[in-house]
Regions:
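Non-catalytic alpha/beta scaffold blocks inside enzyme catalytic domains
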Residues: 1-181
Length: 181
């Protein structure tokens, strides 16, 4: 059985002003707390749980936790299974047993909840192989909407990446847990 999600904080104490800069460097930490029902945890807590062998497998989504702390980087080498969703190569993917390439924020639809609790919608700026830039045809450019595979402007490189939620849904389907969105 898996435990509840473990939400790490990325706080740099003292690096804050009264206008824009926050100590918490994670753009969607409030959204992660609201979705998971968990409070933010420090990397030290994760480090202790792995050392005590209370965590044998770790599933990391779109985060580079090995870069947070040198001690955490070392202890991740001893974990039995490390699975990572990542948008690019980093210290955590280097240690991972399984890596899933996931879409960047510029390749997917979604929302983020800022530190004030305001929901901010993100829309893709780059088309991937499986998804156009809009959920509906209303917001598509004429090039996107009317272009065919024979048009030169449609021949640009499209990457084969999926949003993390689709990767999780595909994994669950492989384990006979049927979910569809």
């Amino acid at each position: 059985n898996a435990e509840n999600p473990f939400v790490l904080n990325h706080v740099i104490p003292g690096d804050e002003d009264d206008i824009l800069i926050r100590e918490d460097k994670t753009p969607n930490s409030l959204g992660a707390v609201l979705c998971s029902g968990q409070e933010l945890n420090s990397p030290d807590k994760l480090l202790d749980l792995i050392k005590e062998k209370k965590i044998k497998a770790l599933y990391v989504m779109e985060d580079d936790i090995a870069s947070l702390d040198d001690k955490l980087n070392e202890v991740l080498k001893s974990i039995e299974v490390l699975i990572v969703h990542s948008t690019n190569y980093n210290k955590t993917t280097e240690l991972a047993h399984v890596v899933f390439g996931s879409s960047t924020y510029a390749e997917k639809h979604g929302t983020m909840v800022n530190f004030q609790g305001r929901i901010q919608r993100i829309r893709p700026a780059v088309a991937t192989e499986e998804m156009d830039r809009a959920l509906d045809g209303m917001k598509m450019s004429r090039w996107d909407k009317f272009g065919t595979k024979f048009d030169r402007w449609q021949q640009g490189k499209k990457f084969d990446s999926k949003p993390s939620w689709k990767i999780i849904a595909m994994l669950l389907n492989q384990f006979d847990v049927k979910i569809q969105y």
